[in-house]
C-alpha cells in the first residue's frame, strides 16, 4: 500500500510470527540484492517492510510491482547468523531499573539477571536510535512495563528491556525502556543474529 508520496508499505499476513518475520526479511534482502532503480532505503520490522523511493525516478505502482515479483523468491546468497557475546555490568549505576524489573516479575534481581543471560536473544531488526538492535526471545516470565517518564539521556551501551523485548542503545539518547545493565562493547548485528549476554562485575577502566 502507498505510504506517503515516496514509500510503499508491505505487510505480511497469515502464518506464525516467525514466518511473517522471515518473509519480510527475505523480501527486503531480495529487493536490496536487485538494486532496484529509485529505491533509496528498506526498513524491515517484525511483519512489514517500508520501501522508500525517489519519486522522480519511479512510482508507487512500479515499486509495488517490484515487491510482488520479489515476494517468495529465494535470496541468492545468505550470510550465516553471527552469535555476539556481549559483556554487561548489571544493576547499580549501570542498571538502575533492575530492582523495579525484579519487583514486576516477582523475582530477585539475581534471578532476573540469570534469565536474561540464559536467553539467546534474536535480533529482529535495527531501530531507533539508529542501529539499535531490537531483540526478542525473552525467557523472563512476563512482559516489562516502560518507565512512567522517559529519561532525557540514556548512556551509550545501556541494555534495556520493555515488553518481551531487549535493546542495546548504540548512542546516548532519550529513552523509556527499563535499564538493567550496560555494556562497553560496540557491535553491529544484523537481523537474524543472536546476542548472548555475559555478566561482568565492574566497568572496564578507561572506557
Name the predicted role of every residue range.
Residues 1-207:
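Glycine-rich active-site loops that engage anionic ligands at enzyme catalytic sites
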Amino acid at each position: 500500500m502507498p505510504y506517503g508520496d515516496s514509500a510503499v508499505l508491505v505487510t505480511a499476513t497469515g502464518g506464525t510470527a516467525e514466518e511473517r518475520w522471515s518473509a519480510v526479511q527475505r523480501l527486503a534482502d531480495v529487493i536490496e540484492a536487485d538494486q532496484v532503480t529509485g529505491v533509496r532505503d528498506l526498513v524491515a520490522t517484525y511483519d512489514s517492510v517500508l520501501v522508500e523511493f525517489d519519486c522522480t525516478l519511479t512510482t508507487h505502482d512500479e515499486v509495488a510491482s517490484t515487491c510482488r515479483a520479489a515476494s517468495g523468491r529465494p535470496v541468492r546468497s545468505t550470510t550465516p547468523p553471527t552469535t555476539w557475546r556481549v559483556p554487561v555490568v548489571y544493576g547499580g549505576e549501570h542498571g538502575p531499573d533492575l530492582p523495579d524489573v525484579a519487583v514486576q516479575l516477582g523475582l530477585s534481581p539475581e534471578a532476573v539477571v540469570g534469565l536474561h543471560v540464559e536467553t539467546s536473544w534474536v535480533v529482529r531488526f535495527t531501530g531507533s536510535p539508529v542501529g539499535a538492535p531490537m531483540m526478542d526471545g525473552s525467557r523472563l516470565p512476563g512482559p516489562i512495563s516502560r518507565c512512567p517518564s522517559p529519561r532525557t539521556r540514556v548512556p551509550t551501551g545501556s541494555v534495556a528491556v520493555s515488553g518481551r523485548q531487549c535493546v542495546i542503545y548504540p548512542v546516548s539518547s532519550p529513552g523509556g525502556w527499563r535499564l538493567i545493565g550496560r555494556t562497553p562493547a560496540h557491535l553491529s548485528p544484523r537481523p537474524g543474529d543472536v546476542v548472548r549476554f555475559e555478566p561482568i562485575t565492574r566497568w572496564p577502566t578507561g572506557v
